[in-house]
């Protein structure tokens, strides 16, 4: 028997006395008191953005209104003992009565049994509130409970008590989600307890099971909370450094509702700008730097994805990109492709990340052991002039999904004309234009011009109405050999155009029709014109007079299509864009509103006109709906008259409607159209040079696709460079003059320019004419005693 009755009470049941005050009795709430009423529960759910019965559909995007650590959670099953949203730990403390045989003692025993059932809640509450001593006592109680129960699977029981069954969140995750001054000590206690009970590996690598945060571990949370010391402790304790967080919250599809970082802890540290943790993870032998997520993206893909259009974020992304690439020393890391077949370079181009794209294309590493990681190599420098070799791997059209094709053909990129000004893209396109594209463009212009001339002559010297159509192959004075050859040429060329443009239309994407600079509408008008020509020729050969309608439309479209070839001149290239943009944006909107007015007022005015007499002498020009619409159209263009129609039911009302119509259309709508067209022309004029360059780039690639493979290989740009042993790359030489950057020491490859050949554009392009066609990058390095400056 105990000497004092108080010794029978557990430690948690003792009175607590405040310093200098009277003892305070902490009583435990009844289960009924712990259960919120229906009204109060609904009130708290509304605060957190929940609904009583949430309905999730597959089509609607998820709304992440509930954080990873929420203290307000629904209990739909009726059994809330496993929930990780505990009440205050003080609610579990009760005063032990002095008499063990009294009814209050029996009640205390029952309450003790209830506290054991709520042990999980109390552990979660202790770790979230930073109660170190209480956590030690609770873990000791849990360990004692395991010892008293025989035949118990201790590891499973402990994991059950330390893990929330509804989300898979452990008390370790709970502690990391609620950072406080005691968090480090709590983490140490939990890890020591797990190791002592042989559940460390399961405990530290437990993953979220909730759909939103599925796969997230304690290591991910520690990194996200920027806890470097705790991260190091977790890694040393055996945390999985290659775990993948695949929850919906981390899906790039919902990037505006969540955060995509590449799933792995290393990618998370890199995307949140934590270089110390990145270094810590990369020094760990277990870390797989080349790990790819469920979309095939590696860490470099993830960095490209999180880059934005403001300088601060781009700067840290570039630093992280550099750090990871240099520390890994693995060139293949940047050549890995995701599930869409894109490397980090190609992904930057597809997403329109101009700053990151510029950084990758012009990255130059001067240290000799790591020089193979560069994409730019300075061959020689003399004063302000330097000659650089740009790596064309995945840039030129010789590879699938090349950067050049992605930028030119991806109409979803708003700043693609800006990216085409980057090197080596700008010089590469310029070289292609001068080498073969301008000659092909000129030949195409000549053929189409001759085609239109021939079509016009054949149409002009056709049989007139008073002459019968000849037999298709009857060579008489009405159809000479010259006219027959002309028709055959027109038919053959129109057939070629229809086949070529038909294939182009078939390959068009819906987004191409939304862009003025995609040439989609030119493909349509070229195809329609060719089909009209073919149709008119066959109708004529079979003596159908309806051929004339097709022929007239074909001639009009044929000469209008000559506007396509204005892109060969910078001063005229923007006119076709202006016309397309005015028609598709301004005129179509005007016509929609105008037709509404025209139909409405036409019906109203025609309804006011009385029926015409049989002699039709006093018939009004507004007598029918079609006549009224025609007269209103004349008023719009200033050819109609504002006359009072005496044979109308209400002449004054009729005149009032006419005046209102003129004000709304002739005065208001037409002037609005003129103002909108003026604004469109002004906006296009500001971007005229960039628009012209994008037009020309698309034309160059279209002509390049028409070349046979053997001819395309002859026109391949660049020169073969040896970067390292068995590492040869195709590089483009670009000479640059930078008067603002004088170089006292540059990490270049050759000591002088060597013999060079003059080109038409010496300051931009310089072809090497050295005796060896292969440029060896290890040929020369300067002495180390001079201070090195950036190139």
UniProtKB/Swiss-Prot annotation:
InterPro entries: Ankyrin_rpt, Ankyrin_rpt-contain_sf, Ion_trans_dom, TRPV, TrpV1-4. Keywords: ANK repeat, Calcium, Calcium channel, Calcium transport, Cell membrane, Cytoplasm, Ion channel, Ion transport, Lysosome, Membrane, Metal-binding, Repeat, Sodium, Transmembrane, Transmembrane helix, Transport. The chain crosses the membrane at residues 431-460, 480-508, 520-540, 546-566, 570-608, 650-686. It is a multi-pass membrane protein. Residues 461-479, 541-545, 609-620, 647-649 are extracellular. It is found in: Cell membrane; Cytoplasm; Lysosome. Belongs to the transient receptor (TC 1.A.4) family. TrpV subfamily. TRPV3 sub-subfamily. The lineage of its organism: Eukaryota, Metazoa, Chordata, Craniata, Vertebrata. Residues 95-105 have a biased composition (Polar residues). Expressed in keratinocytes and hair follicles. Residues 621-646 dip into the membrane without crossing it. One of its GO terms (cellular component) is cytoplasm. One of its GO terms (biological process) is response to temperature stimulus. ANK repeats lie at residues 117-148, 170-198, 214-243, 261-291, 298-330, 340-362, 398-420. The keyword Ion transport applies. The keyword Hydrolase does not apply. GO terms for molecular function: calcium channel activity; identical protein binding; metal ion binding; monoatomic cation channel activity; monoatomic ion channel activity; sodium channel activity. Non-selective calcium permeant cation channel. It is activated by innocuous (warm) temperatures and shows an increased response at noxious temperatures greater than 39 degrees Celsius. Activation exhibits an outward rectification. The channel pore can dilate to provide permeability to larger cations. May associate with TRPV1 and may modulate its activity. Is a negative regulator of hair growth and cycling: TRPV3-coupled signaling suppresses keratinocyte proliferation in hair follicles and induces apoptosis and premature hair follicle regression (catagen). Residues 1-430, 509-519, 567-569, 687-791 are cytoplasmic. Activated by cannabinoid that binds to the vanilloid binding pocket. Diphenylboronic anhydride induces pore dilation and enhances cation permeability by promoting the conversion to a homopentamer. It comes from the Eukaryota. This is Transient receptor potential cation channel subfamily V member 3.
